[in-house]
C-alpha cells in the first residue's frame, strides 16, 4: 500500500521507536522506569461497571452526530459550577484528548502556518501539526531553567505573520513544568 506524502512526513513517535528496546531489556530482567506512555492510575468507578452490567438495549445505535445531550449538559453544568460558563454549542465530546487536539489543530492551521510549542513537547504534536501542513516553531527550554518558557521576550521572538497558535499544557508534558498565575496570564 502506498501511504500519503503527509503521513510519510510524520514518522514514528519516539516512544514507539524505543518500546521494542525497553521490552527486550525487561525480558532480560533489567529494571525499567517507565516515563513514556501514561496509563490511568485512578480506579474506574463502580457505577460504570454497574451500568454496563445492567445495560440491556438490544440495538447499539450510533450516538447523535451533535453529541449525547446528557453528556453535553453535564459538561456545561460542570463549567458553570467553576465560574466558566459555556453553552452546549461550545462543547465537542471526543474519545480522547489527542483526538480533540488533532481536530482543533485541523480547524485552525493551514499549509504554511506556524504554531509555537515549548520543547521538549509531547511527541505526537509533531504528527498532528504535520498533517495540517503547518510547522512547529519551538521555544527551546533547558533543565537548568526548569523548562520555563513563559518569558515575554522568548515568546514574542517566536511570533510572526505565520503564527496561528501557541500550544502548551499546564503542567507541561513531558517536563512537568507548572506555570505560575503570572506566566499563565502572559500566555
Give the ranges of each region predicted by the language model.
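A short helix-loop-beta submotif of the ANL/AMP-binding
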Residues: 131-137
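Active-site phosphate-binding strand-loop segment of PLP-dependent enzymes
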Residues: 141-187
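Structural signature of beta-strand start/N-cap positions in the alpha/beta core
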Residues: 114, 135, 164-165
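N-terminal small-domain helix-loop-helix segment of the aminotransferase-like
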Residues: 6-96, 103, 154
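Short beta->alpha connector loops at strand-helix junctions that form conserved
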Residues: 119, 138-143
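Short glycine-rich anion-binding loops that position phosphate/pyrophosphate groups of nucleotides
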Residues: 40, 98, 170-174
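Aromatic/hydrophobic pocket-lining residues that form π-stacking "cages" and hydrophobic walls in ligand
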Residues: 18-22, 125, 186-187
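Conserved PLP-anchoring active-site segment centered on the Schiff-base-forming lysine
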Residues: 90, 107-129
Amino acid at each position: 500500500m502506498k501511504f500519503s506524502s503527509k503521513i510519510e512526513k510524520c514518522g514514528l513517535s519516539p516512544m514507539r521507536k524505543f518500546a521494542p528496546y525497553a521490552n527486550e531489556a525487561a525480558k532480560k530482567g533489567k529494571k525499567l522506569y517507565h516515563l513514556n506512555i501514561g496509563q490511568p492510575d485512578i480506579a474506574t468507578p463502580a457505577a460504570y461497571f454497574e451500568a454496563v452490567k445492567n445495560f440491556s438495549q438490544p440495538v447499539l445505535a450510533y450516538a447523535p452526530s451533535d453529541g449525547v445531550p446528557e453528556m453535553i449538559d453535564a459538561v456545561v453544568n460542570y463549567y458553570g459550577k467553576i465560574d466558566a460558563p459555556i453553552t452546549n454549542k461550545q462543547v465537542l465530546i471526543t474519545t480522547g484528548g489527542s483526538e480533540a487536539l488533532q481536530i482543533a489543530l485541523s480547524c485552525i492551521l493551514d499549509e504554511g502556518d506556524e504554531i509555537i510549542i515549548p520543547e521538549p513537547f509531547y511527541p505526537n504534536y509533531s504528527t498532528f501539526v504535520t498533517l495540517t501542513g503547518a510547522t512547529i516553531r519551538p521555544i527551546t527550554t533547558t533543565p537548568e531553567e526548569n523548562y520555563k518558557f513563559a518569558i515575554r521576550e522568548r515568546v514574542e521572538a517566536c511570533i510572526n505573520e505565520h503564527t496561528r497558535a501557541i500550544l502548551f499544557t499546564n503542567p507541561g508534558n513531558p517536563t512537568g513544568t507548572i506555570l505560575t498565575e503570572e506566566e499563565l496570564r502572559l500566555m
